[in-house]
């Protein structure tokens, strides 16, 4: 049986503990949201096939722990990333102020070949909380920071309601694709079949 080629796009999600990284990933991949908070231990990832310009790509999304004691694991998980997503909670100023620390840590540990042009996307999450009355990070402030870092794309999201989640990940996928080398990952059919079974088990709706 003939084999086919597929491009794997690796995306890393970073941000303080509790900003909604896991919820954003689950909302995008599985269309699910849980009010029960459970801290990520180390790192985890989900995959989803996305279509860009009539081509199918596999998006591998890594959800990393926000706790400091796990940050030393960064090198192993960050290497080979095609895009980095920085997430903050619009209701917690400290999570916004820490975005620069997360960005710098990623660039140091991932060591991308062209750090000046490496693609980042920023998500201001939890816009649904208290009807928006609790927010302390304004859209203007967030966009100003993004502009100062090379015009990083910015989206305001609600993992709970699904607001802007698809649009954000479409942008993430396109930016990851721009950074992906021309060479494609070669996957034999035997591995592809196993991957398809794994995908069905996650409940992914592509």
Swiss-Prot record:
GO terms, biological process: protein transport
Motif (Effector region): 37-45
InterPro entries: P-loop_NTPase, Small_GTP-bd, Small_GTPase
One GO location term (cellular component): nucleus
Family matches, as Pfam families: Ras
Keyword GTP-binding: yes
Domain of life: Eukaryota
GO terms assigned for molecular function: GTP binding; GTPase activity
Keywords assigned by UniProt, alphabetized: Cell membrane, GTP-binding, Lipoprotein, Membrane, Methylation, Nucleotide-binding, Prenylation, Protein transport, Transport
Gene: RABG3C
Lipid addition sites, S-geranylgeranyl cysteine: 204, 206
Family from the record: Belongs to the small GTPase superfamily. Rab family.
Cell compartment(s), UniProt: Cell membrane
Modified positions (Cysteine methyl ester) in chain numbering: 206
Cited PROSITE patterns: RAB
Name of the protein in its database record: Ras-related protein RABG3c
Described function: Intracellular vesicle trafficking and protein transport.
Membrane topology: Lipid-anchor
Positions annotated to bind GTP: 15-22, 63-67, 125-128, 158-159
Organism: Arabidopsis thaliana
Family annotation (SMART domains): RAB, RAN, RAS, RHO
UniProt cross-references to CDD domains, sorted A to Z: Rab7
């Amino acid at each position: 049986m003939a084999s086919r080629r597929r491009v794997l796009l690796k995306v890393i999600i970073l941000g303080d503990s509790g900003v909604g990284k896991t919820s954003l990933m689950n909302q995008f991949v599985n269309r699910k949201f849980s009010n029960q908070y459970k801290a990520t231990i180390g790192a985890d990832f989900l995959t989803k096939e996305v279509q860009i310009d009539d081509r199918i790509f596999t998006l591998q999304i890594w959800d990393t722990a926000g706790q400091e004691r796990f940050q030393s694991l960064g090198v192993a998980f960050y290497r080979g990333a095609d895009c980095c997503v920085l997430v903050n909670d619009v209701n917690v100023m400290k999570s916004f102020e820490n975005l620069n620390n997360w960005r710098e840590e990623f660039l140091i540990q991932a060591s991308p070949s062209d750090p000046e042009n490496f693609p980042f996307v920023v998500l201001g999450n939890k816009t649904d909380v208290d009807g928006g009355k609790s927010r302390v990070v304004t859209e203007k402030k967030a966009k100003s920071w993004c502009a100062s870092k090379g015009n990083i794309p910015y989206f305001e999201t609600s993992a709970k309601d699904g607001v802007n989640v698809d649009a954000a990940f479409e942008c993430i996928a396109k930016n990851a694709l721009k950074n992906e080398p021309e060479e494609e990952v070669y996957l034999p059919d035997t591995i592809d079949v196993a991957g398809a079974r794994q995908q069905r088990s996650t409940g992914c709706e592509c």
